[in-house]
Swiss-Prot record:
Organism of origin: Christiangramia forsetii (strain DSM 17595 / CGMCC 1.15422 / KT0803)
Protein name as catalogued: 4-hydroxy-tetrahydrodipicolinate synthase
Pathway in which the depicted protein is active: Amino-acid biosynthesis; L-lysine biosynthesis via DAP pathway; (S)-tetrahydrodipicolinate from L-aspartate: step 3/4
A GO BP entry: diaminopimelate biosynthetic process
Chemical reaction(s) catalysed: L-aspartate 4-semialdehyde + pyruvate = (2S,4S)-4-hydroxy-2,3,4,5-tetrahydrodipicolinate + H2O + H(+)
Length: 291
């Protein structure tokens, strides 16, 4: 399959009870993805609790993932921020060996205009030695990258090869798909609307639930890409309750509960994030038991 088509997963960061990085669990998580049909891995994205990691910890995570992956799957590294010059500098000094692309979130908090967003990605596209996937997640950034801006970026910044579209708006996603060149990838960043986006011409997903249910979720996406609509929706409706559960109290509290139930990680987060409530954990555990 073409690179960055199908199911990518935004890896969590497993922690031990003392909140240090659980490298063994991370290695096992990577291997679990490889063995169950995932097409690529995203390292140090939002789901990884990157905001709580030191630079040394980030380098350790990169090392562990690369060693566990052993060249099996393409790797995407999260590099982004709301200081354009800072992102440019990070791209210039970062060890990108072993990575195939960059995932870069649209600037958050300072709420740039569409022109500011365009110029931000223009600057980092010039600095990046790797292809860039833009990440639009207005629920976290407070600014939405509009379809027209995505199209402008797609046509003018050749190093930007796709967008992880996580506005949760299927109409906006379809407009993006209709505007951009055929070789520009519109990738779902919302697990619940991954299938309709894929059937509308999207290229798959960068998923959270996918790392917990890798075989079933990646099979759903492949079925959608192959036009097997009935088969894809059958899987979607089987998986859908888990998607509601894992985001009910924020990410990655829910997916960590699910992965802990499967025995892959310890259910530990760093403040300001906290574990899911006992009520939600019970729902997730019951889902896993009956899946």
């Amino acid at each position: 399959m073409e690179a960055f088509v199908g199911t990518g997963v935004a890896l969590i960061t497993p922690f031990k009870e003392d909140l240090s990085i659980d490298t063994e669990a991370l290695s096992n998580l990577v291997k679990y993805q490889i063995e169950n049909g995932i097409e690529y891995l995203v390292v140090l994205g939002t789901t990884a609790e990157s905001a709580t990691l030191t630079q040394d910890e980030k380098e350790l995570i990169k090392k562990v993932v690369k060693e566990a992956n052993a060249g099996e799957l393409p790797l995407v590294l999260g590099v982004g921020g709301n200081n354009t010059a800072g992102v440019v500098e990070e791209l210039q000094i970062a060890d990108l060996d072993g990575f195939d692309a960059i995932l870069s979130v649209s600037p958050y908090y300072n709420k740039p205009t569409q022109e500011g967003i365009y110029r931000h990605f223009e600057a980092i596209s010039k600095a990046s030695p790797l292809p860039i996937i833009l990440y639009n997640v207005p629920g976290r950034t407070s600014s939405n990258v509009l379809p027209e801006t995505i199209n402008r970026i797609a046509r003018n910044l050749k190093n930007v090869i796709g967008v992880k579209e996580a506005a949760g708006d299927i109409v906006q996603a379809m407009k993006m798909i209709s505007l951009v060149p055929d070789d520009f990838k519109v990738i779902s960043g919302d697990d619940m609307i991954t299938l309709p986006m894929t059937l509308a011409g999207g290229k798959g997903v960068i998923s959270v639930i996918g790392q917990g249910l890798p075989k079933e979720f990646s099979n759903m996406v492949r079925a959608g890409l192959e036009g097997k609509v009935s088969e894809a929706y059958q899987l979607h409706y089987k998986i859908a309750p888990s998607i509601e559960f894992i985001f009910a109290e924020g990410n990655p509290a829910g997916i960590k509960t699910l992965l802990a139930k499967k025995g892959i990680i310890s259910n530990t987060l760093r403040l300001p994030l906290v574990e899911a409530t006992e009520t939600l954990q019970s729902k997730i555990n019951s889902f896993v038991d009956n899946f």
